[in-house]
Amino acid sequence: MYKDIKVDPAQLEAALDARLKIRAGFDKPTAGMAAGMTQVNMISVPRDWAYDFLLYAHRNPQSCPVLDVLEEGIYATKLAADSDIRTDFPRYRIWKDGEMVDEVTDAREIYNAHPDLVTFLIGCSFSFETALQEAGIEVRHIHDDTNVPMYLSNIKCEPAGRISGNMVVSMRPIPSHQISEAVKITARMPSVHGAPVHIGHPESLGIKDVNKPDFGDASRIEAGEIPVFWACGVTPQAAVMNSKIPFAISHAPGYMFITDIPDRAWMG
């Protein structure tokens, strides 16, 4: 649970402006938008699958930290005023029997056709990036205006009911002398994935080529930098694929919902 702290009105305005911009058709990755405000991932599954997914998230809190659950027919989250999860992500993915069948920028029609969907909002590692930057650690994909690289790893998640799958990880190249600071900062924020799950040696995670991510864009890795991997909120999409859930809606990786909760509210 986040701490109830005073929010800078300018930050609230920036978050609302970002949501309105997205609602009006902005279609790019959201890293760096409304800096300092929490961003979230999303997965919507049929009511019949909701308990299995809730249990899956509970058993895998580092990759699937649940920040809010919206019952069927509910599209506004307590995490943001004037919100609609059907329009306020820049891009959505539509899944049938574990296969992605479409990508859209407005999901109202699809939600209306599937009124039994239960939605889970999942913490996102974009929410610790401002803290990294404030500590003088460059976040490469923000600097280069690209999407964060994400990979389907060989780390098996704890299954629950009919749902199983492997962890998806995001990667940020960090100078070797700054890794300990990056670990300290992110470890204080378990609700947005917390400390890294792996440092260096991508092959240990089953990643054959770090320059060919499964989701997002490749990041430059300069001399003296080490690839650092965090659990990622795209893990539910890997579970959808592996478990052949009959229908689901998710965000597109890197295209997040921006809340009214400051990042620092999650710091322990």
From Swiss-Prot:
Molecular function GO labels: lyase activity
Enzyme Commission code: 4.2.1.-
Keywords: Lyase
Name of a matching Pfam family: D-Glu_cyclase
UniProt xrefs under InterPro entries: D-Glu_cyclase (IPR009906), Putative_hydro-lyase (IPR038021), UPF0317 (IPR016938)
Family assignment from sequence similarity: Belongs to the D-glutamate cyclase family.
HAMAP family xrefs: Hydro_lyase
Annotated protein name in UniProt: Putative hydro-lyase ABAYE2440
Organism: Acinetobacter baumannii (strain AYE)
